[in-house]
Amino acid sequence: MSWYVLVEANESYGGDNTWDLVAKVPVEGGQAAAIARAEEISRTSLSGSLPEEEGRLVFRTSPTSWLVEKSRLVRHERSAEPTEHTQHLRISVAELVLAREPAVPPKKRLFHR
């Protein structure tokens, strides 16, 4: 089958522990190419650049997965001090093992009398 880099995000608003799949990046060249692409994404971003104002901690949690903590200081009008906004990403390498399109629902029958 084919290899992907999966990116899940958790913005941690109010202690919410919901992870959402935010990107499925197809990679040609096999597992080694997918690992290299995943590591690149963990160190930069999906676009390949790292915004200057963004802080980043990258943890390699296994040979094929990373946990990224991104932080940014945000200044609100009502506060003299900036607030730190933190987002977490899980980046992993995955092999697609099944691809099945959803079934088309049957057409509604119109009954005539």
Language-model region placement:
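Generic hydrophobic secondary-structure signal
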Residues: M1, V5-V7, V27, I41, ...
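Short aromatic-glycine-(Arg/Gly/Cys) micro-motifs in beta-strand/loop hairpins
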Residues: M1-A23
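Generic structural motif
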Residues: N10-S12, G30, L73, L96
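Hydrophobic/aromatic beta-strand elements that line small-molecule binding cavities or substrate pockets
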Residues: A23-P26, G55-L57
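A short, charged, amphipathic alpha-helix used as a generic interaction element across diverse proteins
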Residues: E28-E52
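Short, mixed-charge low-complexity intrinsically disordered segments
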Residues: T44-R113
